[in-house]
């Protein structure tokens, strides 16, 4: 298997793809956890950074200004472990999500070939459809883990809504299930399906072309991953912000780091309208910088690990077949 010009949909068996996807999710989650914590803190901040008067009604919660100041504040107030807050359920989420996503992506591609014939759809359209179905299926299967991990990542040191999976997990399940698990499922789909569609379509399109260039350190795949991630995240970021805001809509939202999180009515459209009215257009892109800083390495690490894990598992499979012969 080549890691240069071949397309992901043409590589590996189903079991190898599943194992490689799980490995990629495990590694990627640990690497980008600190940036994810910072991103969520910024996304849940509803006051204007440019208007000091908007800070008058804040009580107790810190005011985060930018990626590095937020990072320093978390380190100072919560220690280095605060940057990996909620990482246990998040690791489980990423492992399951990545395994299901890559397996579904591969399976969908094969079904499209069998149903429509190979080469009927343009490669970018094929990747767009497979990416949408892969992302949607993985989101549906793993969504209960998302609000659990999100709840554990957002509290501060002195006002913890969930202190640990062992201590607060059972109580959280009783209070939130089943509506709390799936209450914003549609918002998750609305964000992840277009994101994964754009990402895989862009990545699969750029990857073969960039592999023909003589880039230093054989970085063509890394460049393709980074470009695809930045483009996809920029297009869908407001939907991700709305999903995070709606996930904290519970009676305990006043106990989080930010005390002034408003209630949103009318679903995704209503939340978008409320944010535009209260915070302006800039409010829809709060935390975009750190999100892009997170998305680029997250996608790069995920795809890099996936490709090499797939190569490893494929090699193991080939050796096993040779030994049986």
UniProtKB/Swiss-Prot annotation:
A cellular component term, taken from the record's GO annotations: mitochondrial inner membrane
Solcar repeats mapped onto the chain: 12-111, 122-209, 216-312
GO biological process: transmembrane transport
Major location (coarse): mitochondrion
Membrane-spanning ranges: 17-35, 92-108, 127-143, 184-200, 223-239, 287-304
Entries under InterPro entries matching the protein: Mit_carrier (IPR002067), Mitochondrial_sb/sol_carrier (IPR018108), Mt_carrier_dom_sf (IPR023395)
Job description of the protein: Mitochondrial transporter that mediates uptake of thiamine pyrophosphate (ThPP) into mitochondria.
Family: Belongs to the mitochondrial carrier (TC 2.A.29) family.
Protein name: Mitochondrial thiamine pyrophosphate carrier 1
Organism in which the protein naturally occurs: Chaetomium globosum (strain ATCC 6205 / CBS 148.51 / DSM 1962 / NBRC 6347 / NRRL 1970) (Soil fungus)
Lineage of the organism: Eukaryota, Fungi, Dikarya, Ascomycota, Pezizomycotina
Name of the coding gene: TPC1
């Amino acid at each position: 298997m080549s890691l240069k010009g071949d397309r992901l949909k043409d590589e590996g068996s189903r079991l190898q793809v599943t194992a490689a996807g799980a490995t990629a999710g495990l590694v990627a989650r640990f690497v980008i956890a600190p940036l994810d914590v910072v991103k969520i803190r910024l996304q849940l901040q509803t006051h204007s950074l440019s208007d000091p008067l908007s800070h008058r009604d804040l009580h107790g919660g810190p005011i985060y200004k930018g990626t590095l100041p937020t990072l320093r504040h978390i380190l100072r107030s919560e220690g280095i472990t605060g940057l990996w807050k909620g990482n246990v359920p998040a690791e489980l989420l990423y492992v399951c999500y990545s395994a299901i996503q890559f397996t579904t992506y591969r399976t969908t591609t094969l079904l499209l070939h069998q149903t429509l014939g190979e080469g009927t759809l343009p490669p970018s359209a094929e990747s767009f459809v497979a990416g949408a179905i892969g992302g949607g299926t993985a989101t549906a299967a793993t969504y209960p883990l998302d609000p659990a991990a999100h709840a554990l990542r957002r509290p501060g040191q002195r006002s913890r809504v969930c202190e640990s999976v062992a201590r607060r997990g059972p109580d959280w399940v009783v209070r939130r299930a089943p509506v709390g698990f799936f209450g914003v499922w549609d918002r998750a789909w609305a964000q992840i399906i277009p994101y994964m569609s754009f990402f895989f379509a862009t990545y699969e399109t750029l990857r073969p072309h960039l592999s023909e260039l003589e880039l230093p350190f054989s970085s063509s795949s890394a460049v393709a991953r980074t470009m695809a991630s930045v483009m996809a995240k920029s297009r869908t970021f407001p939907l991700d912000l709305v999903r995070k805001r709606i996930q904290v809509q519970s009676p305990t939202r006043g106990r989080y780091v930010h005390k002034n999180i408003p209630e949103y009515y009318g679903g995704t459209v209503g939340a978008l309208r409320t944010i535009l009215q209260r915070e302006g257009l800039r409010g829809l892109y709060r935390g975009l910088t750190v999100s892009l800083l997170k998305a680029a390495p997250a996608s790069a690490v995920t795809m890099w690990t996936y490709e090499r894990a797939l190569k490893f598992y494929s090699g193991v499979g080939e050796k096993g077949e040779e030994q049986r012969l």
